[in-house]
A protein has these predicted regions:
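N-terminal signal-anchor module of multipass membrane proteins
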Residues: 1-79, 87-102
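Intrinsically disordered, low-complexity non-transmembrane regions of multi-pass membrane transporters
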Residues: 1-23, 225-241, 432-445
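Juxtamembrane interface elements at the cytosolic ends of transmembrane helices
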Residues: 4-5, 35-39, 43, 182-194, ...
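Membrane-embedded helical hairpins/re-entrant loop segments and their flanking transmembrane helices
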Residues: 10-11, 17, 39, 43-74, ...
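C-terminal ends of transmembrane helices
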Residues: 14, 66-78, 121-135, 185-197, ...
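Hydrophobic, membrane-embedded alpha-helices of multi-pass small-molecule transporters
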Residues: 20-35, 171-184, 203-205, 209, ...
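Short, non-helical or kinked segments that cap or interrupt transmembrane helices
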Residues: 76-89, 134-143, 200-207, 285, ...
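Membrane-embedded alpha-helical modules
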Residues: 102-223, 339-445
Length: 445
């Protein structure tokens, strides 16, 4: 596995990248992440007005940027990008509505719960317990299974949410996604066939594909220029904790401690995926510092007035495609997010890129993540028990992404949170099965 990963990387995590190139490649990660989607969904769930929705979006960009830079430079010290998860959205809306709504004490109660949960994560990292948990519970075969399930769980989102069920004519959606994906594949093929232009076409493949897809969508009348024109050039985030205030409610706090536990499981899968694509064995120090960085990122998000920002697995797929894993690129991505937090017109431009264009690239990214997980598993000496450790989590991942919404909605609230995170269910299943089966010796941490 090491040779394969090394040969696929053009630029390693600690390799320097010129500022201009890092800026462009950082934007490539930003475009692939769809960070604006969860806050837009949450704003709709809470019936926010235009001002509140814009404020939530700006706060999310700002928190994602600060969190990304914190993790990459000071804590995890790996190419890691932070962004909002879909998992807490239902709980967040529920807490707000149960506490008086937006005009009552709702947001203050939500932010109070988020602050306490974030502090718990920081304390977990400071205690050194997180690394011990990983060493004890997550050998290589479990880690590879989690990575595989991370990629697998994202495929339906790439296809359904961004293409088949996205706004617009479904045939146009498929056409846009196909053109974008084909452009990406052509760029990668050119980089392999003609090594002299590898740097341009491999490292810039996603930006080129998104640019082509956006131009085609504009020719179809699918690009929303009005939303861009109506947006202000510059504005400070207005909906922070200073605006909403803070309040503490025990039930809400306990709810979000559970949510944070689920998010931590997802983030662990993201770090495994990033370690696999960069051929880096995550150290004990990185595990503990990473969870401290995760907690501080979520604390920043709460102070900014938005939901937790956690590790994004999409970026591992981007690295697999582009071959660039430089931390400077991720610092640039974090800087882009901060810029987007203040420049509403630029945010509106990126948000106006049609979902099928994003989906065409996203679908390929998810597959590369899944294959990296399978590659980790392939390197292990597996026996009969491993068939169940690997297979059952994959089955459950597929089952949960295909589970009808009416079944999920009928479940108790806490179970709904778990059902909303196939990665967490897969990880817990793999860990439990591994404990029940004969012990493995290959550790990832």
């Amino acid at each position: 596995m090491e040779n394969q990963v090394e040969s696929s990387l053009i630029v390693g995590p600690d390799d320097p990248v010129p500022a201009g190139e890092a800026t462009l490649l950082g934007l490539q990660h930003v475009l692939a992440m769809d960070v604006y989607v969860p806050p837009i969904i949450l704003a709709g769930m809470m019936a926010m007005g235009a001002a509140d929705s814009t404020g939530l979006l700006q706060s999310t960009f700002l928190a994602a940027g600060i969190g990304t830079i914190l993790q990459t430079c000071f804590f995890m010290k790996m190419p890691v990008s932070q962004g909002p998860s879909f998992v807490p959205l239902g709980a967040a809306a529920g807490v707000v509505m149960a506490s008086g709504g937006l005009r009552g004490n709702g947001m203050a109660t939500l932010l109070g719960a988020l602050v306490v949960g974030a502090i718990v994560l920081v304390l977990l990292g400071l205690s050194g317990a997180f690394q011990k948990i990983i060493n004890t519970l997550v050998p290589a075969v479990v880690g590879g299974t989690i990575i595989t399930c991370v990629g697998l769980s994202l495929i339906p989102s790439a296809l359904n949410d961004n293409i088949f069920e996205a706004t617009g004519n479904i045939y146009q959606n498929i056409e846009l996604a196909a053109i974008t994906a084909l452009t990406l594949l052509i760029c990668v093929a050119i980089s392999i066939r003609f090594p002299r232009v590898q740097k341009l076409f491999k490292t810039g493949s996603i930006v080129i594909a998104l640019l082509v897809g956006t131009l085609v969508s504009a020719s179809m009348g699918r690009f929303d220029w009005k939303s861009v024109a109506d947006s202000a050039w510059f504005s400070f985030p207005q909906r922070t904790m200073l605006h909403w205030g803070i309040s503490f409610n025990l039930t809400s706090i306990l709810t979000f401690i559970i949510i944070y536990a689920i998010l931590t499981t997802e983030t662990t899968g993201t770090w495994f995926a990033m370690g696999a694509v960069t051929n880096h064995k995550i150290t004990s120090r990185q595990w503990n510092h990473g969870i401290i960085g995760e907690g501080l990122s979520c604390l920043v998000a709460a102070l900014a007035g938005t939901t937790p920002v956690t590790g994004y697995s999409t970026n591992a797929g981007v690295i697999s495609i582009t071959g660039v894993a430089s931390k400077r690129v991720f610092i640039a991505a974090g800087s882009w997010f901060i810029v987007l937090g203040f420049f509403a017109k630029l945010s509106a431009f990126l948000a106006a890129i049609p979902a099928p264009v994003i989906g065409g690239v996203f679908a390929i990214i998810t597959v590369t993540i899944m294959l990296n997980g399978l590659n980790v598993i392939r390197q292990q000496q597996t026996g009969e028990s491993d068939l169940y450790i690997i297979g059952l989590p994959i089955i459950l991942t597929l089952a949960l992404v295909l589970l009808p919404s009416k079944v999920t909605n009928a479940a108790p609230q806490m179970i709904q949170y778990l059902l909303g995170s196939p990665i967490a269910v897969a990880a817990i299943t793999a860990i439990v099965l591994n404990l029940l089966m004969p012990l493995r010796h290959n550790k990832l941490a």
